[in-house]
């Protein structure tokens, strides 16, 4: 680390930086970061998008070999970036759809899964969204991420199935709330673990996703 030599062969997945730089330009007019964002997009195209190794970038999980600890977070965030930045480009929307398929296939659980004592699957609140391979359990922020992406995909394509899926996860979000305080709890489990208030950043992500979906439903009454 002292001389800049990588400590592991893992690649950075710079999606959060791309979205930050784009937001600085769109919201604050600070466009000097646009070229940096485009360079990061080109880097992503030659690495993660090419290999489809959406490995987790969590600060509390050690680096792993390729494909052992994938997560859907950066894949979904990049899909949201594509839908926001290039809403009229069919190829961008299709790439976002591919990323959504990956996230749903690997991390969304629509009904009670097979029994597994180690992860307490019989106590999960479903439908739910799992966080990462190394922590394959339902987390509220993971559900929030899929709610946001399903909503964005619906708004770009008009596919009512996307909206229906967003609503199903949102309904589960309300069932997972603390019944007394209304706080969005981190762990979607019907046990003592589920009573832990958990991470405030996860709760705020859930609140933002629910508010956004609520505004959409107030504007539209689609036939589901």
Regions found by a protein language model. Give the residues of each.
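Glycan-recognition and catalytic cores of secretory/periplasmic carbohydrate-active enzymes
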Residues: 1-224
């Amino acid at each position: 680390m002292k001389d800049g030599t990588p400590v592991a062969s893992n690649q950075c997945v710079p999606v959060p930086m791309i979205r930050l730089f784009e937001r600085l330009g769109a919201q604050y007019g600070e466009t000097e970061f646009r070229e940096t964002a485009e360079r990061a997009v080109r880097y992503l195209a030659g690495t993660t998008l090419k290999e489809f190794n959406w490995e987790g970038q969590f600060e509390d999980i050690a680096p792993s070999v390729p494909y052992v600890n994938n997560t859907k977070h950066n894949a979904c965030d990049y899909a949201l970036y594509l839908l926001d930045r290039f809403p009229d480009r069919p190829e961008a929307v299709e790439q976002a759809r591919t990323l959504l398929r990956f996230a749903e296939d690997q991390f969304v659980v629509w009904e009670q899964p097979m029994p597994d004592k180690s992860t307490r699957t019989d106590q999960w609140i479903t439908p739910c969204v799992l966080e990462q391979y190394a922590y394959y359990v339902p987390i509220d922020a993971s559900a929030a991420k899929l709610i946001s992406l399903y909503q964005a995909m619906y708004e770009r394509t008009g596919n009512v199935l996307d909206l229906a899926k967003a609503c199903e996860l949102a309904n589960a979000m309300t069932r997972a709330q603390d019944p007394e305080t209304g706080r969005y709890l981190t762990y979607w489990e019907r046990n003592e673990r589920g009573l832990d208030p958990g991470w405030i950043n996860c709760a705020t992500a859930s609140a933002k996703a629910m508010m956004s979906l609520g505004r959409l439903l107030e504007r539209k009454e689609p036939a589901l």
